[in-house]
Amino acid sequence: MKFKDYFKKNLIYILSFPLIVIAVYLPIVFNKSYCADLEYVQGAKGAIYNWNELGRYTLILLKKISFTPYNWILEGILFIIVSYLTLNALAYFMHLANSRLDTRLIFILSGIALIFPTFCEQYYFKFQAAEVLFGIFLLCLSGIFLIRTINDGEKLPFVISVVLTTLSFGIYQSMPNILLVMYIGLFLILCCTAKEKRILKNAFITVVIQFVLSFMANYLISHFLCKQGSYFSDKIMWNKLGASTCISYIKHYFKVVLLADSPMYSFAFIVALLIAYIALFVFFSKDILRVILTVLSIFGLIIAPFGIAIISGFEPDTRTQLALPFSIAFLLFFALSVLGRKTYKEEDADEGEKKDSKLIYFGIIFLALVLALNLIPSLRLVYTRYKIIQSDREHIQKIAGDLKEYNCLADSEDALDVIIIGTLPFYGDSVCVKSYLGTKEYILFSAFELDAHTPPTYFFSTNRILSAMETEGYYFKKPKVSNNMEDANNKAKDMPKYPENGYIKQYKHYVLVNL
């Protein structure tokens, strides 16, 4: 089916399904509240924050094009636009992989790939939310061009695919992992649907060459155009912790993901594994090689999302785990493709269409339930973040109102530094996701908790809190050095705590706030 016909036939889904993605994440992205590192992005010049040494050349380029490191209104609008582009590009990529599968199923699968709790943590860093999603859009678009090369052998779409993939790699470090899952998923679907071995051979060779060329191009661009830092090398733990320790971390991480032993994951992964396992037994082919390739592809979809953990030898930051929902979607995509293949009879099209119609309704209900497995924990995280923002705003207004009575306004010539001792943890109601022992996810932290125990104690958290106040329009002088922190910690021990009277005191060199 040509894109024009596909567009006309599926217009209602093209317009409506992205609204689900937008509704889930927009409360996080489209607001002016504080998030960690926002002050560094807004205050950065030239290279923009530390993105240059991270090799995020495309992200820097996109910020240059928009003429601002961060504007919350612009970021929100861009996120809406890119959500439409990304979900529809992913749906069309899946449609090209198996055009016989009902497009309603494909649109739900696209939603499963793009709605997941780990995306909430990623989009908490809202100053790059639209750009990260745009990177995924580039991968989907690249995949569309790649399928044209696989089917028709055209060279120009292949070149475009390499360029788009390279640009995507320059946005965020998780993009190669997502692409790996997408290509393994594509190959898995072709194992199920391709009638000729030639297509499988072309797909394998084309995908490998494209991935290698894109990876090399990204490496060369990063090496020659970006400042070389130690951010990624510092995260490799194999030489620092030893093989046995690293393996234990990887096993623990796999267990956490598989059993959803964290609010950042769902049971959708294990459900998808079970369904794919059943489909594998249903799948039948006299071609032994095709069966072997199918088994290897499924194994690849299981392992690929853990690529960052395997390379680093440690449990990665949750916000980098963006490949897992794509793996879930493609495992389910395989299962539906197998069922469609077994129920459809080439020699009796009418009978096959009747059987397919029943299968479609069953598939829609089943996929909707899997989508709900991703949607419910994601919405809990979004709700929790909303409540944290409300709580922070109330504290900021109260404390900032009291601080105005002291000599610490940022625009005063003789202003004293503000030092804030203590934290204000967020507890929330029964619906909120509770922080747990060892919580690393920023989305669960109040602005009054960030970096509190990073040495020197309360120095960095003070600057975080004052930056959060700036997002609400309150500007107080930040401490640039930590010389007074020890003295402030000692004095705070004898002071009342917020919100009791006397929780703020002015001393010779600073104004002290005791939380």
Place the predicted regions along the sequence by residue.
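Alpha-helical transmembrane segments of multi-pass integral membrane proteins
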Residues: G135, E315-T343
